[in-house]
Regions:
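Bacterial N-terminal signal peptides
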Residues: 2-14
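Short, acidic Ser/Thr/Gly-rich low-complexity loop/linker segments typical of extracellular
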Residues: 42-60
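Beta-strand-rich domain onsets/edges
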Residues: 13-24
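N-terminal active-site segment of His-dependent metallophosphoesterases
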Residues: 24, 81-168
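Extended active-site neighborhood of metal-dependent phosphoesterases/phosphodiesterases
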Residues: 73-79, 166-227
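Short, ordered, surface-exposed loop/turn motifs in non-cytosolic proteins
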Residues: 22-45, 62-63
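A short, solvent-exposed loop/turn motif at the edges and junctions
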Residues: 43, 64-89
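Conserved catalytic scaffold of divalent metal-dependent phosphoesterases
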Residues: 31, 86, 99-108, 121-124, ...
Length: 227
């Protein structure tokens, strides 16, 4: 009996931790204080949809870092330092209190839409950041000339920085000058140092810095009839 006490306690402890990890996350998806039905909510592995009142309940996987939504057509989301806030980290206090997501209505439901796509800013230092700033200022002037029928998001197709994780925050702040949502995709140079991204086993630590700044590495959103 004495010999089994330690292992049994250890097993019970593991069971308790496992049970805590499986605690469901609950909340609502709201627009103007009203629940939005049918919105997909996920942790990247498991999915659910909001009910007729905009409420959801999701049991997250043990390795989940975010809970996030697939922004439905006809809506956009608030922006923080250029990053669309369709996600929240699961290690925040808000998880225990419930995670609510805010949607903003598009004027024309996004049926007529444009977007700007760019790739490989690959910022390494402050000098290159200033070059990016000049490009973004020109881009802002160009976008301002387009008809303002709906929100015009920007898509950055990877390699935001060039193997310099410390440049993610200043780069994200630079993109904020555009005053519109910037959807980021991860590129090979956005991982940790090159040596840390050569094997699948290093994928999680190599992408963690990106996910801390921009949210999940894969996600979706809807514009008009396009997913």
């Amino acid at each position: 009996f004495t010999c089994l006490a330690g292992p049994m306690s250890f097993v019970l402890l593991l069971f308790a931790e496992h049970a805590m990890a499986k605690e469901p996350v609950c909340g609502r998806v709201l627009c103007g204080g009203r629940g939005v039905p049918g919105v997909v909510v996920t942790d990247g592995e498991r999915f659910t949809q909001t009910d007729s009142h905009g409420a959801y309940r999701l049991v997250c996987g043990e390795n989940a870092m975010h809970v996030y939504i697939s922004v439905p057509a006809g809506y956009t989301v608030p922006v923080a330092e250029s990053a669309p806030m369709f996600w929240i980290r699961v290690d925040t206090l808000a998880v225990r209190e419930g995670i609510d997501f805010t949607l903003l209505r598009e004027p024309d439901k996004g049926r007529r839409h444009r977007f700007v796509a760019m790739g490989d800013p690959q910022v390494r230092n402050r000098r290159e950041l200033s070059q990016l700033d000049s490009l973004l200022a020109a881009l802002k002037r160009t976008v301002a000339q387009l008809p303002a029928s709906s929100e015009i998001p920007v898509l950055v197709a990877g390699d935001i920085v060039f193997n310099r994780p410390k440049m993610h925050l200043p780069s994200k702040k630079s993109f904020a000058v555009l005053g519109r949502p910037v959807f980021y995709a991860i590129g090979n140079h956005d991982h940790g140092p090159i040596r840390d991204s050569e094997t699948p086993a290093n994928e999680e630590p190599a992408t963690r810095r990106f996910r801390e700044h921009y949210g999940p590495t894969y996600y979706s959103f809807n514009r008009g009839r396009v997913h």
